[in-house]
Amino acid sequence: MGAVHGVCYGMVGDNLPSRSDVVQLYKSRNIHAMRIYNPDQEALTALRGSGIFLILDVGGVDEVRRLGRDPSYAAGWVRSNVQAYYPDVLIRYIAVGNEVPAGDTGIILLAMQNVHNALASANLSSSIKVSTAVRFDVITNSFPPSSGVFRDPSGLVPIARFLDSTGAPFLANVYPYFAYRDDRGQNIRLNYATLQPGTTVRDNGNGLTYTSLFDAMVDSIYAALEKAGTPNVRVVVSESGWPSAGGFGASVENARNYNQGLIDHIRSGTPKRPGAIETYIFAMFNENRKPGDEVERNFGLFFPNKQPVYPTTFPN
C-alpha cells in the first residue's frame, strides 16, 4: 500500500473537538490512517465511509484479560466493535493491549488468539490482523541494532510466532525522544535523534550505517524478530512522536523537525529493511487530562481548537 502515515487520536482531554470534526481534520490534512485506544462508538460512527485506515485498540489491561479468559466474550466484542462497522470503517489491525506489563504477556497471547478466532469465524481474519502494541524496552541490547534481542523471550517469542502464523505485524511504540531525554545529550546527538542530517553511526555487526536513532531502534526490533525465528514479521510503528513543551529537549522546533522528518522519511525505510514503514505519529492533539509528566500533555500536532502547534505537511 505504499507509505502509510497515520496519527494516533487520543481522547484524554476535556476540550477536544467532536469526533466528526476530528475525522474531517484528518481528511483535510491528508492523514490517511488513525489509531484509537478503545472502541469509541462515536469515533467509529464518524469514521464510516471516510476511507481512513484504522488501528483499533481493545482498551485497557482489564479488557485484555476478559478477552483472554473468555472466547465467547471475544466473539461478542468482535460482533459489536468490528462486524458492526467493517467494511464501512477500514479496520486494519486490532491492538490487543498497549504497553501491557511484561507479567501479562501470557494473557495477551490468549486474548489475541481469541480475537483472531472470532474474526476467522466471521470470515474477517484475512482482512483484519490481530497484534499487540509494545514499548520499545521489550528490546534489550538495542545498540548496535544488530544486537537487539527480546528482553523476555518466554513472553515475546510466542507472540512473534503467532504474528508470523497469522500474517500480522509487530506493533511497536518507538520514541527516540525518551532515549534522548534520558541520555541528557551526553551520547545521543540532537540531530541524530530528530532525523536531521549530520551524524552517522556504523553497526559493525551488520556493516550498515545509520543516520537516525529511529532507524536504529526499528532495526533492533527486526534483529530481535530474526533471533526469535520470525524474520518475516513486519514492524509497524504504532506510536512515535516528539513533545513541543514540558521537558528536556521538548520544543516546537525539535518536535517539528522530528515529526516532519518522520513523515518524509517513512517512505524510504531503514538500512536493514528498505521500503515504506507504516508509522503512526503520536498524537493528533495536546491532551490536557493525560497523566504523567508535562511532556505527556504536549505531544499533539494540533491544539484542541484544531490549530496546528507547528506546521506539518502530509503527502497526498
From Swiss-Prot:
A molecular function (GO) term: glucan endo-1,3-beta-D-glucosidase activity
Principal subcellular localisation of the protein: cytoplasm
GO cellular component annotations of the record: cytoplasm
Alphabetical list of Gene3D superfamilies matching this protein: Glycosidases (3.20.20.80)
Active-site feature positions: E99 (proton donor), E239 (nucleophile)
Keyword check for Cytoplasm: yes
GO biological process per UniProt: carbohydrate metabolic process; defense response
Annotated SUPFAM superfamilies: (Trans)glycosidases
Enzyme class: hydrolase
Superkingdom per UniProt: Eukaryota
Catalytic activity from the UniProt record: Hydrolysis of (1->3)-beta-D-glucosidic linkages in (1->3)-beta-D-glucans
Localization terms from the record: Cytoplasm
Entry's EC annotation: 3.2.1.39
Keyword terms: Cytoplasm, Glycosidase, Hydrolase, Plant defense
Stated family: Belongs to the glycosyl hydrolase 17 family.
Function: May provide a degree of protection against microbial invasion of germinated barley grain through its ability to degrade fungal cell wall polysaccharides.
PANTHER family per record: GLUCAN ENDO-1,3-BETA-GLUCOSIDASE BG1-RELATED-RELATED
Protein name per the record: Glucan endo-1,3-beta-glucosidase GV
